[in-house]
Swiss-Prot record:
Family statement: Belongs to the universal ribosomal protein uS9 family.
Taxonomic placement: Bacteria, Pseudomonadati, Pseudomonadota, Gammaproteobacteria, Legionellales
Domain of life: Bacteria
Keywords from the UniProt entry: Ribonucleoprotein, Ribosomal protein
GO biological process, one term: translation
Name of the protein described by the UniProt record: Small ribosomal subunit protein uS9
SUPFAM superfamilies: Ribosomal protein S5 domain 2-like
GO molecular function: RNA binding; structural constituent of ribosome
Keyword Ribosomal protein: yes
Intrachain disulfide bonds: none
Gene Ontology cellular-component terms listed: cytosolic small ribosomal subunit
Organism whose genome encodes this protein: Coxiella burnetii (strain RSA 493 / Nine Mile phase I)
Pfam families, per the entry: Ribosomal_S9
Length: 139
């Protein structure tokens, strides 16, 4: 007979071109991203801070273990995608009877629930970039 699966909550987060699947389990507070600890995966402290934000806001960083797989984009986009995924997983945990359904409003006020719609604007034909044109010469 198969062993009972450990209870976990799944949250999918996206930011720019990054996509993250986040698994939230009760534990001691370790954060593993693509098989590496958070401190090894992200070199910049700001990216690590962004990932921890939802847990710190709710003061539950030592109650959950976070396992995330993320692909696409760069450091900033990946950190934002993981944060979005953690937020969704926390809301799912909360609404299934965790804390009485109060976390969503707290996380929404902090701005973590809304998916950031900003994307890189495409390069246009005849321009150097999305908006930069050729240099104007009066004569």
């Amino acid at each position: 007979m198969a062993q009972a699966a450990k209870k976990q909550n799944l949250g999918t987060g996206r930011r720019k071109t990054s996509s993250a699947r986040v698994f939230l389990r009760s534990g001691t507070g370790q954060i593993i991203i693509n098989g590496l600890p958070l401190d090894e995966y992200f070199g910049r402290e700001t990216a690590r801070m962004v990932v921890r934000q939802p847990l710190v806001k709710l003061d539950v960083q030592s109650r959950f273990d976070v396992y995330a797989t993320v692909q696409g984009g760069g450091d900033s986009g990946q950190a934002g995608a993981i944060r979005h995924g953690i937020t969704r997983a926390l809301i799912q945990y909360d609404e299934e009877g965790g804390e009485g359904g109060t976390w969503r409003s707290t996380l929404r006020k902090a701005g973590f629930v809304t998916r950031d719609p900003r994307m890189v604007e495409r390069k246009k034909v005849g321009l150097h970039g999305a908006r930069r044109g050729t240099q104007f010469s009066k004569r």
